[in-house]
């Protein structure tokens, strides 16, 4: 973080170029070499199908547009843009993993990756007191919501006894499982 130097414009242009190549490559892969069957990777924690490909394309296009608009803003404000583009691409990778996650652990890790990038991007302008205040507030609210999400994941794991996202519906259990009513009662009492 710091003031603008001569390589800031070049760094942003290189990042935007590679994001464009990545988006076009992914779009060509989706349109011409699309795999019809759903694929699972990483011990079935990641699922790749038609819906995830559409969402990945959306996230790549959004990242490209954010980088173009953000680069203009950073040049106008006189801030370095190298870290901005790295954080944008890391957040994009986290969002792509988030839409592909098929397991609560992968969902949580991907969501936290995105959140950490967003915390830093919110407080990117270190010369602005408002930017730093917004970053701290976002960090505090994000930590609180992350804890609540983790408690919810543990609750679903306790009821379903399966950490997979689709396994949490627990079709093998009876519909009148007393354990589920116990957890629901504890949730409602708070």
Regions found by a protein language model. Give the residues of each.
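Alpha-helical transmembrane segments of multi-pass membrane proteins predominantly involved
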Residues: 1-190
């Amino acid at each position: 973080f710091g003031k603008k130097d001569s390589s800031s414009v070049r760094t942003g242009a290189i990042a935007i170029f590679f994001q464009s190549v990545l988006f076009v490559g992914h779009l060509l892969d989706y349109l011409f070499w699309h795999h019809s069957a759903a694929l699972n990777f990483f011990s079935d924690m990641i699922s790749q199908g038609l819906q995830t490909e559409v969402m990945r394309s959306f996230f790549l296009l959004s990242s490209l547009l954010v980088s173009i608009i953000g680069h203009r803003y950073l040049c106008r404000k006189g801030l370095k843009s190298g870290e901005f583009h790295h954080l944008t691409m890391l957040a994009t990778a986290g969002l792509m993993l988030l839409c592909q996650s098929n397991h609560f652990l992968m969902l949580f890790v991907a969501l936290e990756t995105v959140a950490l990038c967003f915390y830093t991007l919110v407080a990117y302008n270190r010369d602005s007191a408002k930017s730093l205040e917004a970053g701290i507030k976002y960090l505090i609210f994000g930590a609180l919501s992350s804890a609540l999400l983790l408690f919810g994941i543990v609750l679903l794991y306790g009821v379903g006894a399966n950490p997979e996202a689709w396994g949490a519906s627990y079709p093998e259990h009876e519909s009148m499982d007393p354990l589920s009513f116990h957890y629901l009662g504890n949730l409602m009492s708070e």
